[in-house]
Amino acid sequence: EQPAADEALAAGESLRESAAFDLVLSGVGAFPSTMRPRVLWIGATEGASELMAAAERLRAALEQRGFKLEERKFRPHLTLGRVRPQGEGGAKRALAVIPSGELARCTVRGACLMQSVLGGRSGATHTVVRMFPFR
């Protein structure tokens, strides 16, 4: 596992070539759909192309190191949370009341590699493994 982790960290260094950019988050949705929400998200509007360019840079670096990558297209978003099947009704109500306009604006100055460890009833624990500041 350690050689793969080292290769992933090396690929992450490619993100340092990205420039800082402004990001606007607006509009909410759900994966796989709003009728069957499992993940709630806020979409990235302004700054989405910069996010996609950074993701493509990382994809290329990972692919070059032999990692098998997802085939589905990257969709820039901020995950709000996961929905258990029994919480579907509440998630649908939340989607209906969250405003559709601009919800947040920030400057993105870097990316983090995160480690997520599932913890049963308490949910996942997320830890920053390494930060990759943008130029």
Where do the model's predicted regions map?
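Histidine-dependent nucleotide/RNA phosphoesterase domain, centered on the 2H-phosphoesterase fold
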Residues: 1-135
